[in-house]
Amino acid sequence: MEFDTIAAISTALGEGAIAIVRVSGDDAVEKVNRIFKGKDLTEVPSHTIHYGHIVDLDTNQVIEEVMVSIMRAPRTFTRENIVEINCHGGLVSVNKVLQLILAQGVRLAEPGEFTKRAFLNGRIDLSQAEAVMDLIRAKTDRAMNVAINQMEGRLSKLIGRLRQDILETLAHVEVNIDYPEYDDVEEMTHNILIEKATHVRAEIAKILETSKQGKILREGIATAIIGRPNVGKSSLLNSLVQEKKAIVTDIAGTTRDVIEEYVNVRGVPLKLIDTAGIRETEDVVERIGVERSKEMMSQADLVLVVVNYSEALTNEDEDLFRAVQGKDFIVIVNKTDLPQAIDMERVIELAAGNRIITTSLIEEQGIDELETAIADLFFEGTIDSADVTYVSNARHIGLLTQAGKTIGDAIEAIENGVPIDMVQIDLTRTWEILGEITGDTVHESLIDQLFSQFCLGK
């Protein structure tokens, strides 16, 4: 597939030690060579790096001192010729280098266009392309490992095997329909068809079993910290984040809005949401914060309910416990450095079997136990299994769920005695749906939409 030559700054904008301008296309080397003073880049071997200068052809002025990497097709990320110009990391100089390249007839790349070309040129499939962004956005080592496994094609291989199983079954059905008179063709009975379709459904279900943990690793656990004012919610946020993100005072109602922060807890990304203290108030601004707190609580995957060890439970505390019933929650009894006034038996009753952690945040006690409880609640020690291929992308999960339903419809049709040639429709649809994950049967509009979410230069 032939494309024009594109270029973009591939490193984050801002001051830094190094910035990289990436150029990809059939004539990428020739275009860069025009403005490069040093070795003749058109004559150098592939996968080599060369020192020189970028020169403004109009003024013959040296613009930058650079190192230029030459990578020739097809052994490149895009399977096109790629040139990467390593500049100093100043905003002015790197933008000037980019402008000089564009002046040679090179087009500014769209967001994600380098990865899109890698997909369109067959270097990677669609699930691997999506994993590139997952790797960039990974917030923990475990999330990074999930993305790398997907980039290496683990999910693609699983999907490929399933599609091959369906394809072989479809071919067997076709032969039975078109050549029923041939004695050397194995008859595709309803029992054989059910066995093959059931195997595919079981494999899809097995992959989907990892989706909850995979999605958490990719997107994080939305965790709301709730409680009455001044029970230690902001102190808990600061302790988990290990820096002062929220203002902590003895004045009730200090936190008036929702504060969000990502934190790595035992390899699990937590999207921590410190909410305004929930209480009845006449303060208009605080009341808005309280309403937002209730909204965040309802949307959270996990709720940390904070109560005060040195105060008796109030009606507001008990209302909070009732509000979180049916959700995953952990109770934090804070301020254990102060004399006890809380009824712990009542706390145990309200917790209804959920974990209770006692903390003294001012003395930094109880945080390790809380972090362990959070990790155990969602992963139960299974997350470290190197053999598990996690499915974490919402698009993939939706397609797998859809494929599972379609193959289920096929099984139901077979069991009801529907003719085999009619069952073929559901089998074909399942094969197509699974192909959308890897991009084998995907619409061009979806491809454009997916790659538009990438950052510029990737």
Curated annotation (Swiss-Prot):
Cellular compartments per GO CC = cytosol
What does the entry comment about cofactor binding?
Binds 1 potassium ion per subunit.
What range(s) does the TrmE-type G domain occupy? 220-379
Tell me which domain of life the UniProt entry assigns to the organism this sequence originates from: Bacteria
Q: Where does (6S)-5-formyl-5,6,7,8-tetrahydrofolate bind?
A: R22, E84, R123, K458
The alphabetized list of GO BP terms reads: tRNA methylation; tRNA wobble uridine modification
Which of this chain's residues are annotated to bind K(+)?
A: N230, T249, I251, T254
State the compartments where it is located.
Cytoplasm
Entry keyword annotation includes DNA-binding: no
Protein residues bound to Mg(2+): S234, T255
Question: What are the recorded GO MF terms, alphabetically?
Answer: GTP binding; GTPase activity; metal ion binding
EC id: 3.6.-.-
This protein's cofactor list reads: K(+)
Matching entries from PROSITE patterns are given as:
G_TRME
Which amino acid positions bind GTP, per UniProt? 230-235, 249-255, 274-277
Tell me which UniProt keywords the record has, alphabetically: Cytoplasm, GTP-binding, Hydrolase, Magnesium, Metal-binding, Nucleotide-binding, Potassium, tRNA processing
A Pfam family matched in the record: MnmE_helical
* Assembly and binders: Homodimer. Heterotetramer of two MnmE and two MnmG subunits.
HAMAP family from the xrefs?
Answer: GTPase_MnmE
What PANTHER family has UniProt attached to this entry? TRNA MODIFICATION GTPASE GTPBP3, TRNA MODIFICATION GTPASE GTPBP3, MITOCHONDRIAL
Q: Which family does it belong to?
A: Belongs to the TRAFAC class TrmE-Era-EngA-EngB-Septin-like GTPase superfamily. TrmE GTPase family.
Q: What does this protein do?
A: Exhibits a very high intrinsic GTPase hydrolysis rate. Involved in the addition of a carboxymethylaminomethyl (cmnm) group at the wobble position (U34) of certain tRNAs, forming tRNA-cmnm(5)s(2)U34.
Q: What is this protein called?
A: tRNA modification GTPase MnmE
Q: From what organism does this protein derive?
A: Bacillus cereus (strain ATCC 10987 / NRS 248)
